[in-house]
Regions:
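Active-site proximal loop and beta-alpha junction motif in alpha/beta enzyme cores
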Residues: 1-73, 79-287
Length: 287
């Protein structure tokens, strides 16, 4: 049995940048175990499996897997899968579609060469002290931007948002894997434990996402779900309206640009992230 698949680069201004994604069509014939094995074989940050789609209604259901586990929500897989559906699968090439993922329905629209998703309302969880990070990083107290808190935020997947003062500290960041993992397990209430460092330097937003997967310290080239959390954080603490590009992946040679368009009004967060997707390849997977 063969099923078609596509490979794309997401949040990429050009090919061979951004975050890689494998998209599998006709995945309703696969078991959960088979999906996990395929995701592990591909070994991208995430792979998606389209289990149902209705072109006439511009809707689809997908499942998202890292090489280790299934995700309830993740940004770059939703953006990339939507691009594939709208530009390679749906013959009518709709500008708007709805993707169903485990946390619910995600509205997606395409405007020019950008695909945008609308995120769920955020939850702001625990705050932490900068001193906590001194035990498992090379950061000093002076490297943290104390104008903002350090806080775990979720819009479906949770991230600890860590404000850093400048690009130099962000670029030269070093983390102790063992001590970081102990801290995450001891302090994060959610099962998705990851750190999202950022700095705002001369109006440029730069970020890094680091987590422990497969007992390894890993850095993500572009993290849409973390970007929705960061956008919510900036709307709450920085400005009630934001249009900016989040630059991620610069320090691992996978330059990514994640577009922010957000507003906060009467405690309602309007969080949208967008990005460009580059088509890389298509083929058939022998199951």
């Amino acid at each position: 049995m063969n099923i078609p698949f596509y490979i794309v680069d997401v949040f990429a201004e050009k090919k061979y940048a951004g975050n890689q994604l494998a998209v599998f069509l006709g995945a309703d014939v696969l078991s959960t175990e088979e999906m996990q094995k395929i995701a592990r074989e591909v070994n991208f940050a995430e792979s998606t499996f389209i289990t149902k789609f209705e072109p006439e209604n511009s809707v689809a259901e997908i499942r998202i897997f890292t090489p280790e586990h299934e995700m309830k929500f993740a940004g770059h897989p939703i953006i990339g899968t939507s691009w594939v559906l709208m530009n390679r699968i749906f013959e009518n090439q709709p500008e708007k579609i709805t993707l169903s993922v485990p946390i619910g329905k995600i509205p997606v629209h395409q405007s020019g060469d950008l695909v945008w998703l609308q995120a769920a309302q955020p939850e702001f969880l625990d705050t932490f002290l900068a001193e906590d990070f001194l035990s498992f990083s090379n950061l000093s107290s002076a490297d943290f931007d104390d104008a903002f808190p350090i806080q775990e935020v979720t819009t479906g997947s949770a991230f600890v948002i860590v404000p850093i003062k400048n690009k130099k500290a962000l670029e030269h960041l070093i983390l102790d894997k063992v001590k970081m993992n102990e801290w995450l397990h001891g302090h994060c209430k959610t099962n998705h434990r990851a750190l999202y460092f950022y700095c705002l330097e001369e109006t440029k937003l730069i970020s890094r996402m680091l987590c422990i997967e497969d007992n390894q310290l890993k850095e993500d080239a572009a993290t849409g779900s973390a970007s929705t959390c960061l956008q919510a954080f900036l709307l709450k603490y920085h400005a009630e309206e934001i249009q900016i590009i989040n630059h991620q992946g610069d320090f691992i040679n996978r330059s990514s640009q994640i577009y922010f368009d957000g507003k906060l009004a009467e405690n309602h967060f309007d969080i949208k992230i967008g990005g460009k997707t580059q088509f890389i390849a298509k083929g058939e997977w022998e199951v």
